[in-house]
């Protein structure tokens, strides 16, 4: 039976696009659904600030009048300009285990990209680094996180069959929370705090942290992450959007800022309780009862034993000087007090030695790996 590809053009079809992932992974113990309303906003060209510099279309694959696959075709013009590339991205790709389906989806993205002057196709990638990146190639028996996507083992097999090659890998670590701050960690943090006259800043009010350092946090990200794979700087509209979206839901005990002698932000560490199990229980919906599971995971005492390390950023001139040790010397006692057993690092670029070096004094387990693929079109 022939595969039919249809561009999403109505709100009903967009909802089907989002829900196909839920259907394909229904009852899968490792997949964590995205929040449905967040996905609606992400794909909305009027609401997502990334569309200032991105263009995209979404496609559904049908077989015998049933949806059997989906994919987003994306061009991040800012990233292409930054890295001097002509690449079309495929993102949010899902398909049944049928080569005709995956080939039809990828062929559609290739043709869409060619029409717009692109020379290569890469992915899975989203609009920006704030979207999930990479296809899982190791760790299929591990629970996914809110910041990543899960996929079946047959996905990368389809990619390789279609001639895709490795473009970049991310690794993920399970980091066990120590009973005490490692001695060397403590010595390093004390030394660099005195040497550079650094201060640890903590907040209890989302409004105050947004007022004082909301803008600076995301400007620091632009500085720290600019050399990383595919990164494109956040625009002012994106920064405003993220400050409004993310800061109010954080447990600020798990947010540590480090400033210099002039109170300028030089490092930030942001973590939060894992929402993986809560999102599974809510099935990606806030209503009618999904909000309860999420609030319980975030703020109630009987929370998950796992936390997610969402963001660690250090100003370039302070990297490799022990600032990460200072961040975690403040955060580890918080994790212990709140009863966390281990942390998920979330994806780190395989070749980013600076990031992986910060786990040197912890017991860790590299338990997942994901890949971005690329090929000429």
Where are these regions (language model features)?
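Generic start-of-chain signal for non-secretory N-termini
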Residues: 1-30
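Acyltransferase donor/substrate-recognition loop-hinge adjacent to the catalytic core
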Residues: 3, 149-230
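A conserved beta-strand-loop-helix scaffold within acyl/acetyltransferase catalytic domains
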Residues: 21-63, 71-81, 204, 208-209, ...
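Short hydrophobic/aromatic beta-strand or adjacent loop that forms the aromatic wall/cage
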Residues: 56, 168-172, 368-372
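An acidic- and aromatic-residue-enriched active-site/binding cleft used to recognize and process polar
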Residues: 74-78, 93-95, 126-128, 178, ...
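Acyl-donor binding region in acyl/amide transferases
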Residues: 82-163, 282-361
């Amino acid at each position: 039976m022939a595969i039919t590809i249809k561009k999403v053009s109505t709100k009903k079809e967009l909802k089907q696009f989002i829900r196909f992932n839920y259907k394909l992974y229904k009852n899968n113990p490792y997949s964590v659904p995205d929040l449905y309303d967040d996905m609606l906003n992400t794909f909305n060209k009027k609401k997502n600030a990334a569309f200032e510099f991105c263009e995209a279309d979404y496609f559904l694959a049908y077989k015998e009048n049933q949806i059997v696959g989906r994919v987003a075709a994306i061009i991040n013009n800012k990233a292409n300009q930054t890295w001097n590339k002509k690449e079309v991205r495929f993102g949010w790709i899902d398909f049944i285990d049928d080569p005709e389906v995956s080939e039809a989806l990828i062929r559609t993205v290739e043709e869409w990209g060619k029409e717009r002057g692109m020379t290569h196709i890469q992915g899975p990638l989203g609009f920006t680094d704030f979207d999930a990146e990479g296809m899982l190639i190791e760790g299929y028996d591990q629970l996914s996180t809110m910041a990543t996507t899960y996929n079946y083992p047959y996905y990368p097999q389809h990619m390789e069959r279609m001639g895709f090659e490795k473009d970049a890998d991310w690794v993920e670590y399970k980091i066990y929370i120590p009973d005490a701050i490692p001695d060397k960690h403590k010595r390093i943090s004390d030394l660099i705090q005195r040497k550079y006259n650094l201060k640890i800043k903590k907040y209890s009010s989302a409004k105050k942290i947004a007022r004082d350092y909301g803008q600076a946090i995301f400007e620091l990200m632009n500085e720290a992450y600019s050399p990383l794979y595919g990164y494109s700087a956040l625009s002012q509209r994106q920064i405003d959007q993220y400050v409004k979206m993310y800061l109010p839901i954080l447990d600020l005990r798990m947010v540590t800022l480090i400033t210099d002698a002039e109170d300028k932000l030089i490092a930030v560490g942001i973590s939060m309780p894992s929402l993986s199990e809560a999102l599974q229980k809510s099935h990606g919906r806030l209503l009618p009862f999904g909000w309860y599971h999420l609030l319980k995971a975030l703020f109630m005492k009987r929370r998950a034993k796992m936390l997610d390390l969402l963001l660690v950023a250090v100003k370039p001139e302070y990297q490799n000087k022990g600032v990460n040790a200072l961040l975690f010397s403040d955060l580890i006692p918080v994790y212990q007090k709140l009863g966390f057993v281990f942390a998920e690092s979330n994806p780190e670029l395989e070749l980013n030695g600076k990031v992986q070096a910060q786990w040197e004094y912890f017991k860790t387990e590299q338990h997942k790996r994901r890949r971005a693929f690329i090929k000429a079109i």
